[in-house]
Amino acid sequence: MSAAEADRWAWLLVLSFVFGCNVLRILLPSFSFFMSRVLQKDAEQESQMRAEIQGMKQELSTVNMMDEFARYARLERKINKMTDKLKTHVKARTAQLAKIKWVISVAFYILQAALMVSLIWKYYSVPVAVVPSKWITPLDRLVAFPTRVAGGVGITCWILVCNKVVAIVLHPFS
């Protein structure tokens, strides 16, 4: 396939990249959740701590406060200490989860921006598609930017149109 033939299919290339990026953006929360589960193994420890607290609370309910005050108070302090430890653990895990999601989102958007910039760079002077100039007469210079080809659709306009169309098509799935 020659360069001229490849340039004829540029509209499909850009459309597929935009579609792929939008699909990935929809799947980003699920991917972030999966990655956080893979990277964090603390959920088992938290469930074990919750089970211990529940067991101590059941034991506390069987102890008579009037007859065995020392044991009751000791058990209550132990429950409070374990609960505080669990809360601290959950806060740390939640902060780490937010950090993981943020890093994944930033990496995705940087990758998407780099992809779009590379497409704009490659097709800067070549029209992505050529249509009869009558179809776009009032806006032909704007639509053709930066190619300056009569009836041509420039890469920037094509990316904007593709983003809008793909967003409308994928809206029910998000």
Curated annotation (Swiss-Prot):
Major subcellular site: endoplasmic reticulum
Entry membrane topology: Multi-pass membrane protein
Residues passing through the membrane, by range: 9-29, 100-120, 149-169
Region span, Interaction with GET3/TRC40: 39-97
GO cellular component, one term: endoplasmic reticulum membrane
GO molecular function terms noted in the UniProt entry: protein-membrane adaptor activity
Cytoplasmic topology ranges: 30-99, 170-174
Keywords: Coiled coil, Endoplasmic reticulum, Membrane, Transmembrane, Transmembrane helix
GO BP term, pick one: tail-anchored membrane protein insertion into ER membrane
Annotated family: Belongs to the WRB/GET1 family.
Function: Required for the post-translational delivery of tail-anchored (TA) proteins to the endoplasmic reticulum. Together with CAMLG/GET2, acts as a membrane receptor for soluble GET3/TRC40, which recognizes and selectively binds the transmembrane domain of TA proteins in the cytosol. Required to ensure correct topology and ER insertion of CAMLG.
Subunit structure: Component of the Golgi to ER traffic (GET) complex, which is composed of GET1/WRB, CAMLG/GET2 and GET3. Within the complex, GET1 and CAMLG form a heterotetramer which is stabilized by phosphatidylinositol binding and which binds to the GET3 homodimer. Interacts with CAMLG (via C-terminus). GET3 shows a higher affinity for CAMLG than for GET1.
Name this protein carries in UniProt: Guided entry of tail-anchored proteins factor 1
Gene that this polypeptide is encoded by: GET1
